Amino acid sequence: MEQYIKTISLQNQNLIIDYLNENILPHMIINPKGSAKGRRQLWIQTAPPLNSTAQWHVGYEDERIMNYVRSIAPEGFTPEAVLVTKGGNIKRHRDARYADYQGMSINLGKVTWYYERSNDQYFWQPNLYESVPAARYDLTGGEVFMFNTKNPHWVENAHPERWGINVWQISKNTRDEYEQFMQDRANGNLTEEQLDYKVAGY
């Protein structure tokens, strides 16, 4: 991790988890494929494309979650896509093209998080080592931190009741696509497929 933001109190963790179990869990899908196969998850607000042929989708609308992540995000970081997960691991990966270098993670439960800090800056640097020794973080719940989404990272030993809230702002490489999507969304010009928030990812 690059920057530790805060620790959420146990009381507030329980309030958040109760809300997620009641309001988010019924809408979640089980990821059928990819590096997080079998994990429960739900995109909030916007579901970005994970490859060059995929479309932008709307996410599930939950303003309470969006307001919360905005309230704890550091200055200069704008939450634009949020993925809520429950249980499940994810294999070593870098986040896709849509993701800006800086991302935020909110951990609510026991999990082991691995991170290879090959790039210590939030921008592209040439001639970096492709792989460096991974740092291991045994998280217990309440941790909020920033990390470089383009550095390899993964999750193991996730407790079945562990929740994660992962937050991105959109990269400059896909900013024009995102703004066009948001304009089409505001004007009611999205396809039926794009209006389906139950899409997989990772």
Regions found by a protein language model. Give the residues of each.
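Beta-strand elements of modular eukaryotic interaction domains
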Residues: H93-A96, M104, A135-R136, E156
